[in-house]
A protein has these predicted regions:
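N-terminal first-folded block
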Residues: 1-27
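Generic structural signal for buried aliphatic residues
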Residues: 11, 48-49
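Short beta-strand-to-turn element immediately C-terminal to the catalytic PLP-Schiff-base lysine
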Residues: 27-29, 51
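Short alpha-helix capping/helix-loop boundary micro-motifs
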Residues: 32-37
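C-terminal structural segments of small proteins and small subunits
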Residues: 51, 55-84
Length: 84
């Protein structure tokens, strides 16, 4: 899994049957934008957990999804180690 930030929504008036009714969000990750199927109801500005490839397709089985939002990240602190 990877972490990204929701940047906006993607609207597709025509899409394959497996994606009908499936929200699609634009997610910024490592300076790039990707489109991901939203499985958790994430909103713009939220940090999210993303699954990719076959792991994403397990959650969206009838769609050709390469990326899926599978969680919303609570505020977190990065643990820092000090070399002695």
């Amino acid at each position: 899994m990877r972490i990204g930030t929701v940047a906006g929504s993607v609207w597709a008036t025509k899409k394959c049957p497996g994606l009908r009714g499936q929200p699609l969000l634009l997610v910024r990750m490592d300076g790039k934008l990707i489109v991901a199927a939203d499985l958790v109801g994430a909103g713009v500005g939220e940090r999210v957990l993303l699954s990719f490839g076959s792991a994403a397709r397990l959650e969206v089985p009838d769609a050709p999804a390469d990326a899926a939002i599978v969680g919303i990240v609570d505020p977190m602190e990065e643990e820092r180690h000090v070399d002695q």
